[in-house]
């Protein structure tokens, strides 16, 4: 087979016992591919491993894990300076794998690994919050954030993305909307939000299409606000057609400012960030990513 440049796989420590992954790596190595493997143990490991990847001269750094691992690796990559910055490869090994699923990464590990190593690179956007924290997929606030951050790890491990829905149903009687004001380019809204989705990608929370029109290379963030005084009637309403739905507010902008009279929490690719003021902006063509040719999130 054709020769491919070396890759470095940054593997979430929870996936070290994945036998099919070990077999896929060994098979590709036998075919002549050079694949370095590093395992994360604590926060900050990804930054160190990306620095090592640059010293090794690899062409691709592969994020092996869920949305949080992809976030950590991609954030480390965009912080690199100079030329010859490795591309991002994606190996979906998390609970929900929302970003990987939405961009069309194969579920089969051997196929996903081959794509991560040999796929074509495409420049994609990322988003940054308050000039510090980044996300590649989505920032969610309100009802959805509290569900994803509070769902027990054992439930997620046992049921995957369905666990978010089950835990949400258990908590409906205690969840209240967040009052806030949101501004963007040609956009202004103020009111009570049950769910806020600001997407570079389209889905979060285990497959929920919060921002169905989002693209990862258009220089824009997609905003969706689900409003209403009561959660259950609103959810029933949003199951209907989106057209002319009074409980859905939409917008698109390269930036959004959110202000709240009280502390609210946004979930950034699985990582919570709390505060009263958020400035979220797009970083156009921030990194190169190996994606399938029929990726639905490309313009």
Curated annotation (Swiss-Prot):
Is Magnesium a UniProt keyword of this protein?
yes
Tell where it localizes. Cytoplasm
Q: Name one Pfam family in it.
A: DAGK_cat
Q: Name one GO molecular function term.
A: ATP binding
Record flagged with keyword Coiled coil? no
User: SUPFAM superfamilies, per this entry?
Assistant: NAD kinase/diacylglycerol kinase-like (SSF111331)
Positions with a binding annotation for ATP: 40, 66-72, 95
- Protein name per its UniProtKB record: Probable lipid kinase YegS
């Amino acid at each position: 087979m054709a020769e491919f440049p070396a890759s470095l796989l940054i593997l979430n420590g929870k996936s070290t016992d994945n036998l099919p992954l070990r077999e896929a790596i060994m098979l590709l190595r036998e075919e002549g591919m050079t694949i370095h493997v590093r395992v994360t143990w604590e926060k900050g490991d990804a930054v160190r491993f990306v620095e090592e990847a640059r010293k090794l001269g690899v062409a691709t750094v592969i994020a092996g894990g869920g949305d949080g691992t992809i976030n950590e690796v991609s954030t480390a990559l965009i912080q690199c300076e100079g030329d010859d910055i490795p591309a991002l490869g994606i190996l979906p090994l998390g609970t929900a794998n929302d970003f990987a699923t939405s961009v069309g990464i194969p579920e089969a590990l051997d196929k996903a690994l081959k794509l991560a190593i040999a796929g074509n690179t495409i420049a994609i956007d990322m988003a940054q919050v308050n000039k510090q924290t980044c996300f590649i997929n989505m920032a969610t606030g309100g009802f959805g954030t509290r569900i994803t951050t509070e769902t027990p790890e054992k439930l997620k491990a046992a049921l995957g993305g369905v666990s978010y829905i089950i835990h949400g149903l258990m908590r409906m009687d205690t969840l209240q909307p967040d009052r806030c004001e949101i501004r963007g380019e040609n956009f202004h809204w103020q009111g009570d939000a049950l769910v806020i989705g600001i997407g570079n990608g389209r889905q979060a929370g285990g497959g929920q299409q919060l921002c169905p029109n989002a693209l990862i290379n258009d220089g824009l963030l997609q905003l969706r606000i689900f409003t209403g005084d009561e959660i259950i009637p609103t959810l029933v309403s949003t199951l209907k057609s989106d057209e002319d739905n009074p409980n859905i507010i939409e917008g698109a902008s390269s930036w959004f400012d959110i202000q709240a009279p009280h502390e609210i929490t946004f979930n950034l690719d699985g990582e919570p960030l709390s505060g009263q003021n958020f400035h979220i902006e797009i970083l156009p063509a921030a990194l190169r990513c190996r994606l399938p040719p029929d990726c639905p999130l490309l313009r």
